[in-house]
């Protein structure tokens, strides 16, 4: 996707599938390593998921940071409600593809649907764990 002046848009608009988006999350979760090979400099990865501006501590380089229910996370979000959410403490990557996005409020820079996706992922994991524990 190119602007009329011939300059590429490098800030958005990746068309992909959930599995490939999850790979981005895994690459950053693993500090730039993929299958044991360092693809991205770990210092660069750390900078990406560290607050960049004092006035906007929720944003790094292309990644948002937040904490939900005591879990620190970082995530990418797209114009149409796509999310790649990484929760390192639980080795968890959540991907949401979509065509609609939630709203941000004046008091919260994170869209309201982020909270829903994280909560639903943990609900699904709890149901899975409950099912696995009762089937033994």
Where are these regions (language model features)?
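Active-site Gly/Thr loop motif
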Residues: 45-97
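Carbohydrate-binding/catalytic loop surfaces
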Residues: 2-15, 66-70, 79
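Structured C-terminal helix/loop/strand segments within mature extracytoplasmic catalytic/sensor domains
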Residues: 78-136
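Structural helix-adjacent loops and short alpha-helical linkers that scaffold large soluble proteins
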Residues: 32-40
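Active-site-proximal alpha-helical segments within enzyme catalytic domains
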Residues: 10-33, 82-98
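Stable alpha-helical elements in mature extracytoplasmic
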Residues: 17-21, 44, 110, 114
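Non-transmembrane alpha-helical segments in soluble domains
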Residues: 22-29, 45-49, 64, 119
């Amino acid at each position: 996707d190119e602007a009329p002046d011939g300059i590429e848009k490098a800030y958005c608009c990746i068309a992909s599938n959930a599995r490939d988006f999850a790979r981005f999350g895994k690459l950053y979760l693993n500090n730039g390593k993929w299958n044991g090979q360092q693809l991205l400099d770990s210092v660069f990865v750390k900078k990406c998921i560290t607050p960049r501006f004092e006035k906007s501590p929720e944003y790094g380089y292309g990644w948002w940071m937040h904490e939900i229910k005591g879990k620190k996370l970082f995530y990418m979000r797209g114009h149409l409600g796509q999310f790649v959410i990484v929760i390192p403490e639980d080795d968890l990557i959540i991907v949401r593809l979509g065509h609609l996005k939630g709203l941000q409020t004046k008091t919260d820079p994170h869209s309201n649907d982020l909270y829903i996706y994280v909560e639903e992922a943990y609900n699904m994991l709890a149901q899975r764990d409950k099912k696995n524990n009762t089937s033994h």
